[in-house]
Each structure stands twice: as structure tokens, then as C-alpha cells.
A protein has these predicted regions:
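N-terminal metal-binding scaffold of metallo-dependent hydrolase/deaminase domains
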Residues: 1-46
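Short glycine/proline-enriched coil/turn segments at helix->beta-strand junctions
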Residues: 30, 46-50, 120-122
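Conserved acidic residues
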Residues: 4, 48-51, 94, 151
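Divalent metal-coordination and catalytic microenvironments
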Residues: 10, 26, 31, 56, ...
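Residue-level marker for buried hydrophobic side chains located in beta-strands
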Residues: 5, 62-64, 179-181
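Metal-associated gating/positioning segment near the N- to mid-region
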Residues: 41, 54-114
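Divalent-metal coordination cores built from histidine and acidic residues
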Residues: 85-183
Length: 183
């Protein structure tokens, strides 16, 4: 059976453009937030769930790091994918996106595999490489990368030539995906 828990009162930040809700309530079923505020209180009362006072705690959306760099994700002498995920989770991040510049430039669909750890609440997204091997000379297969799960394409630290960018736009394989190009 799934555990139901009511945090009441608790401080709730729904979004950055909304004020902090002091004295609000949050209802959870298992690991899912199912209701906030009066709706949470009403649902909890229907189920006979008592509130737990968390007035000094803050419930807020997880942070997102849209462009993490991890040169050696699996064999790094410093940070690895595992240590990055652990540190990000402790710091309040719920999602991160890895740039493609690594020991194996993510310029083909098969290089997008193995990055989502099991038994982990943190979601790992991957940027695909804009060019083959990240060298800025030949385009990678944008459509294949996006179909394989890349959230967008990144040119890395270099600025691709105008002709390469023009060719990518003419091919139209990027659809509506975001493209990161260094300033």
C-alpha cells in the first residue's frame, strides 16, 4: 500500500514568479505530490490523514542545470557521472543536462546510452553534438541524435562556421530543438 502524507503547515514555492505560500499544505502519495493548499487538506481529511507540522521547511521545485560539463563521465580522475549526480541531488537539483564534449563526443545515437542511472530520482538529459567529433567541420546526424533522446544540440566551446550553421538550417533536421552555440 502507498503511504499518504500531509505536510501541514509547510512553506510552498510553486514557481519563481509567484509569492511564497507560508502556512500552506502539501499532500503526497508515495513519492508523488498530489495536492497543495486547501485541496491537500480536504483530500487528507477524506482519507483520515493527519498533518505533520513542517512550518519551518520549504517545499519548492527542484533546480535544473541545463548545461553541465563532464569530460570523463565514467572514468574521470575527478568528477564522474555518479559523483555529479550525488552532488547535484544533495544541492537540490532534480534534473541536469550534460553537454556533449566528453571523452566520447556524443555525436551519434549509440553514444547517448548508459547515462540514466537506475534507482535515481535525478533525471539526466543529454545534449547531442552539433558537429562530428565536436570539431566544427562536419555536421553530426541531428535527426538521429534527437530521435535517440538528445534534448538539443551543442557546438561546444567553438563557434561553427557560418556555412556549417547555414547547412544545418537548410537540412532542417533540428526541427524545433534548441541549439547551443558559444558566444
Amino acid at each position: 500500500m502507498t503511504e499518504t502524507m500531509l505536510l501541514d503547515p509547510v512553506q510552498v514555492l510553486v514557481a519563481s514568479n509567484q509569492p511564497l505560500q507560508v502556512g500552506s499544505a502539501a499532500l503526497f502519495e508515495g513519492d508523488r505530490l498530489i495536492a497543495l493548499g486547501e485541496d491537500a487538506r480536504e483530500r487528507a481529511a477524506e482519507q483520515g490523514v493527519a498533518g505533520q507540522n513542517r512550518a519551518h521547511q520549504l517545499l519548492a521545485p527542484c533546480l535544473v542545470d541545463p548545461h553541465s560539463s563532464l569530460p570523463n563521465p565514467f572514468t574521470g580522475g575527478g568528477e564522474t557521472l555518479e559523483t555529479l549526480i550525488n552532488a547535484a541531488g544533495r544541492a537540490g537539483y532534480g534534473q541536469l543536462a550534460l553537454l556533449p564534449n566528453s571523452e566520447s563526443e556524443r555525436d551519434s545515437p549509440e553514444r547517448l546510452k548508459g547515462f540514466q542511472p537506475r534507482d535515481c530520482d535525478l533525471k539526466v538529459h543529454l545534449w547531442g553534438s552539433f558537429s562530428y567529433r565536436g570539431e566544427g567541420e562536419r555536421l553530426s546526424s541531428h535527426a538521429d541524435l534527437l530521435e535517440a533522446g538528445a534534448i538539443g544540440l551543442s557546438a561546444g566551446q567553438q563557434i561553427p562556421s557560418a556555412s556549417l550553421i547555414d547547412r544545418a538550417l537548410l537540412l532542417g533536421e533540428m526541427a524545433g530543438a534548441p541549439v547551443l552555440i558559444a558566444p
